[in-house]
């Protein structure tokens, strides 16, 4: 009876069963196909740095002669372009092309680049500029060009004292980096650190600051006292750090531009581990006395202290 019933149902629903089996086959095929797409084996990334031409900044003979006496540099335009080139190279995202391959002079390229010449050397972007020295001020103009599209992407100018020529190079790099990548540049930044010198038995520690590329080192303390844990404020104009005052660890505040420093607060115990608040208006530090430690804040405007 069971066999007869089964055969009867199969005959009656044969067309439906075939349709049902088709759905099952399609479903199984879909699962197999999806699984095949998911199985991806990534072994490494592939990043091709952007070929970019950094043309030496042009400079007229009068400006160059005056700057040679002031800065003791043979050609300040070339020096600034070297800073830009080195910054782009170290970022890993750009491939500065050799100047030996350039087909156009810097002064002409800044006014009107021959894009076909730059395309021949495989450049996709071009930086040009010029330097003017007038009234004891350094004026630096630069332009960023899209070689493939044959158009200008950016044009800016900066005026500063001649000794800031390296920083101008960092600022130019920041602008170019942001325009081409969409991310903020980090080249016009400085590093605060503790410099050590002297024999092993008598090390001298000084608070020091330098550009992110290791140049323009400046010592902020004389090395008479131990210094530790320096930290910038958000504007990078002030530094807080740990040193000693009357043989006790104290938190100090230092203005980088003026060199003025002061002890933060008058506490009976010792203060250490200073940090600036995110808005830079307060200093957060640890205060220890009689074996107990607490965290305090000091408002830098009214000097109000809170635990």
Would you name each region that the model predicts?
Residues 148, 211-215, 255-259, 299-303:
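Short loop/turn segments that connect beta-strands within beta-propeller blades
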Residues 38-39, 109-175:
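Amphipathic beta-strand/beta-sheet edge segments enriched in Tyr/Trp
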Residues 184, 196-206, 222-224, 242-251, ...:
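A flexible loop/linker signature enriched in serine peptidases of the S9 family
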Residues 191, 239, 280-284:
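Hydrophobic beta-strand positions that form the internal "hydrophobic ladder"
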Residues 43-114, 127:
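Short beta-strand->alpha-helix linker/helix-N-cap micro-motif
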Residues 19-26:
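Sec-dependent signal peptide recognition
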Residues 185-187, 234-235, 278-279:
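Residue-level detector of Asp-centered blade-edge/turn motifs that repeat once per structural unit
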């Amino acid at each position: 009876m069971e066999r007869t019933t089964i055969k009867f149902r199969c005959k009656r629903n044969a067309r439906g069963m075939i349709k049902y089996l088709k759905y099952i086959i399609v479903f199984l095929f879909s699962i197999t196909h999806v699984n095949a797409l998911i199985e991806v084996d990534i072994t490494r990334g592939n990043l091709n740095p952007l070929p970019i031409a950094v043309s030496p900044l042009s400079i007229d003979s009068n400006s160059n002669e005056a700057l040679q006496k002031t800065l003791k540099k043979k050609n300040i335009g070339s020096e600034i372009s070297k800073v830009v080139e080195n910054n782009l190279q170290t970022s890993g995202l750009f491939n500065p092309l050799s100047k030996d391959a350039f087909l156009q002079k810097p002064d002409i390229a800044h006014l009107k680049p021959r894009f076909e010449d730059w395309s021949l050397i495989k450049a996709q972007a071009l930086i040009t500029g010029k330097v003017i020295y007038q009234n004891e001020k350094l004026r630096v103009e630069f332009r960023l060009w899209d070689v493939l599209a044959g158009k200008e992407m950016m044009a800016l100018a900066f005026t500063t004292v001649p000794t800031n020529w390296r920083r101008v190079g960092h600022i130019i790099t920041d602008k170019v980096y942001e325009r081409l990548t969409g991310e903020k540049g980090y080249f016009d930044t400085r590093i605060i650190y503790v410099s050590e010198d002297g024999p092993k038995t008598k090390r001298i520690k000084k608070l020091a600051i330098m550009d992110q590329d290791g140049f323009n080192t400046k010592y902020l303390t004389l090395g008479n006292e131990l210094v530790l844990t320096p930290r910038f404020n958000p504007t990078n104009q002030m530094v807080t750090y740990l040193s000693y005052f009357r043989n006790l660890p104290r938190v100090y505040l230092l203005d980088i531009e003026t060199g003025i420093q002061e002890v933060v607060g008058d506490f009976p115990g010792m203060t250490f581990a200073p940090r600036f608040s995110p808005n830079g208006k307060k200093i957060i530090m640890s205060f220890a006395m009689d074996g107990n430690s607490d965290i305090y804040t000091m408002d830098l405007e009214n000097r109000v202290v809170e635990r």
